[in-house]
Amino acid sequence: TTGLPENWKAPVTDLNNWPRMIQIAWVLCDATGNKIETEVHIIKPDGFIIPKEASDVHGISTEKAIREGVPLIEVLNKFNAAVSKSDYIIAHNISFDEKIMGAELLRNQVQSDFESTRKLCTMKSSTDYCQVPGLYGYKWPTLSELHIKLFGADFEDAHDALVDISITEKC
């Protein structure tokens, strides 16, 4: 994304609060876990730039996104096609993804089954399993902390959408 929201509790309709999507990836699997489709896209900026602070996190600069990016509306349509074939959407910290995707769908006036599709958050569902100490009991584990707990090692290139969804699928 272009950064983080000013107000994490703001409604998705507060479009100025929610950052812009820069990259998206998804893996569509059948009921037994076999991959049906894998997609990854950089979004071509339209009316916004990618701040250096955000680029430092995910490695996608405004220049790279202009050069390699795809118009957001094309990506939203492909994503909607995948969602329409899905029983569940699974992600790590899905509440953030819901706000970012929801804001982009609203900005582009695109109808989607995204909001009504059942969701599973690997971050929230693995909290008791990972048992990462926090200020008030266990904290929500990062994707890295979940991966370390399950496999005994970290992974490279966190915050690249394809890497993150591939690791989420593995977990």
Model-identified regions with their sequence ranges:
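Metal-dependent phosphoesterase core characteristic of DEDDh/y 3'-5' exonuclease domains
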Residues: N17-I60, N80-C171
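Metal-dependent phosphoesterase signature
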Residues: S55-K78
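A short acidic, glycine-rich active-site loop
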Residues: L15-N16, A65
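Short acidic, Gly/Ser-rich segments with clustered Asp/Glu that frequently serve as metal-coordination loops
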Residues: T1-W8, V12
